[in-house]
Amino acid sequence: MATNGRHQEVGHKSLLQSDALYQYILETSVYPREPEPMKELREITAKHPWNLMTTSADEGQFLSMLIKLINAKNTMEIGVFTGYSLLATAMALPDDGKILAMDINRENYEIGLPVIEKAGLAHKIEFKEGPALPVLDQMIEDGKYHGSYDFIFVDADKDNYLNYHKRLIDLVKIGGLIGYDNTLWNGSVVAPPDAPLRKYVRYYRDFVLELNKALAADSRIEICQLPVGDGITLCRRIS
């Protein structure tokens, strides 16, 4: 679990104080049950210079369980990277399940695509390259996607999380879930003002804090914030 490189502050994929305890969780409950395609993609992604952007293995396991528990069928993912969380979702969905996946970088997505294809899951995925906001705006304008998504996972540009939420709340069904990743930003949300954070970490931290405050005040949703991975907040639409 490397912590060197540009993403040191936000790349550490556990908020536990003990690395040994996190390793115990991985080795006892996560890695032994990790499907072979996910293991293969995790190992491929580990060689990527930006590997710390990937979804952690324990969070992938959590997403898989969650999707099965809510019987999700129509899903969306904003922010794909090499596709580890996308693969977890595709494996958890029924054969006729669908994922609308959006990312500004097709090259990263294509790193994981051969693994997805080999697993026989590519038919579940519609990938769109480019910014997600124009796509969401068009979907809302079309009118036929209102309340049509069972589950939406967002792991993208933190400075647009609130902009995503304003749109996704219309696209997720009542009773459906939106999951926002990195909502604890490697613990920096409680860092003192004089903490030695890198410029981009401090910049995005303010947007994460703003999001957390807005979600807590949004009466249209029930929320649950969990210290899984880098923090994930689940929002269940109730109105």
Swiss-Prot record:
Belongs to the class I-like SAM-binding methyltransferase superfamily. Cation-dependent O-methyltransferase family. CCoAMT subfamily. One of its GO terms (biological process) is methylation. One of its GO terms (molecular function) is metal ion binding. The keyword Metal-binding applies. A divalent metal cation binds at residues 155, 181-182. Keywords: Lignin biosynthesis, Magnesium, Metal-binding, Methyltransferase, S-adenosyl-L-methionine, Transferase. S-adenosyl-L-methionine binds at residues 55, 77, 79-80, 85, 103, 132, 157. Changing residue 61 to S: Decrease of activity. It comes from Nicotiana tabacum (Common tobacco). Pfam families: Methyltransf_3. Binds 1 Mg(2+) ion per subunit. The keyword Ribosomal protein does not apply. Transmembrane segments: none annotated. CoA moiety is essential to enzymatic activity since free caffeic acid is not a substrate for the enzyme. The N-terminal amino acid sequence of the protein seems to have a particular role in the enzyme-caffeoyl-CoA interaction. SUPFAM superfamilies: S-adenosyl-L-methionine-dependent methyltransferases. It catalyses: (E)-caffeoyl-CoA + S-adenosyl-L-methionine = (E)-feruloyl-CoA + S-adenosyl-L-homocysteine + H(+). Pathway: Aromatic compound metabolism; phenylpropanoid biosynthesis. It comes from the Eukaryota. Monomer. This is Caffeoyl-CoA O-methyltransferase 1.
